[in-house]
Amino acid sequence: MLTIALSKGRILDDTLPLLAEAGIVPTENPDKSRKLIIPTTQDDVRLLIVRATDVPTYVEHGAADLGVAGKDVLMEYTGQGLYEPLDLQIAQCKLMTAGAIGAAEPKGRLRVATKFVNVAKRYYAEQGRQVDIIKLYGSMELAPLIGLADKIIDVVDTGNTLRANGLEPQELIATISSRLVVNKASMKMQHARIQALIDTLRKAVESRHRG
């Protein structure tokens, strides 16, 4: 049995057509089904529907053989035991700092609100900047508006939400897209099967971008 961990939303919607190229199609619509384990048209392949931030954990610990996760999630994840063999070039966005429009750069210790705590620590450590990291799980844009933080670090797509709240994107930390991740033990035990799937997905990605 080959188990693939996916999260609902944009990643799932963009991944399913790629899996279809490999003949893997869910037998019911994951967006409408309440099931968290979805069979596919291949009897020995199933999908696990999990939270986006949990995909690397399921794969690392062998509960799933493969998964699809955003590079932002993988950058924040501190575990081991994952291969990242393929950039699927889907769900593309940017991980950026943002602050109030026209605000001067704060002097001294910086307060940064984000859910990407590990990313923030590494980013500012590389700059030699002293920061206080404030972990939030959502509505990041509020933090600078009410004086909770000087800046935020968040995923930015169009930037419209930032601008609607009086903020502007500032420093680019990373360009984000979704990646295929594979459990290291699964790669050894089911190498031929998984490598064939990787090769098929790679061709599908290349074909999509040529077209």
Curated annotation (Swiss-Prot):
GO cellular component assignments: cytoplasm
Keyword Acetylation: no
This protein's pathway: Amino-acid biosynthesis; L-histidine biosynthesis; L-histidine from 5-phospho-alpha-D-ribose 1-diphosphate: step 1/9
UniProt KW Cytoplasm keyword: yes
Gene Ontology BP, a term: L-histidine biosynthetic process
Principal location class: cytoplasm
Free-text comment on this protein's domains from its UniProt entry: Lacks the C-terminal regulatory region which is replaced by HisZ.
Name of this protein: ATP phosphoribosyltransferase
Species name: Pseudomonas fluorescens (strain ATCC BAA-477 / NRRL B-23932 / Pf-5)
